[in-house]
């Protein structure tokens, strides 16, 4: 669920998903075109991961996971829940690896500045 994803982000980055990532760049939040930096690319990959789970309720399904010893571990559950957890885990870890590229200027970045053809495809 989005609430669980927010907890994973906070665990990995020490920043809350809202406001730090909810409307960051062109992909964090509702998605868009042309990722602005590595942080935004993490959100692009997360969007692609969710996009492959068309039969799953990616934003609201509650899954099993644990946060221990600096690691996120996804637990057992339905196929959908396990896949959603993996999408969220990989994205949260990506955001941690991209912390050194995070730019405050991309917080609440206007959609109008995310125009042009897509730079990447899923």
Curated annotation (Swiss-Prot):
Cofactors demanded by this protein: Ca(2+)
Top-level taxon of origin: Eukaryota
Keywords: Blood coagulation cascade inhibiting toxin, Calcium, Disulfide bond, Hemostasis impairing toxin, Hydrolase, Lipid degradation, Lipid metabolism, Metal-binding, Myotoxin, Secreted, Toxin
Cellular component per GO, a single term: extracellular region
SUPFAM superfamilies: Phospholipase A2, PLA2
Residues at which Ca(2+) binds: 27, 29, 31, 47
Family that this chain belongs to: Belongs to the phospholipase A2 family. Group II subfamily. D49 sub-subfamily.
Role noted for this protein: Snake venom phospholipase A2 (PLA2) that has a strong dose-dependent anticoagulant effect. In vivo, intramuscular and intervenal injection causes muscle necrosis. Induces moderate edema in the mouse foot pad. PLA2 catalyzes the calcium-dependent hydrolysis of the 2-acyl groups in 3-sn-phosphoglycerides.
Identification of the protein by name: Basic phospholipase A2 10
UniProt organism field: Crotalus durissus cumanensis (South American rattlesnake)
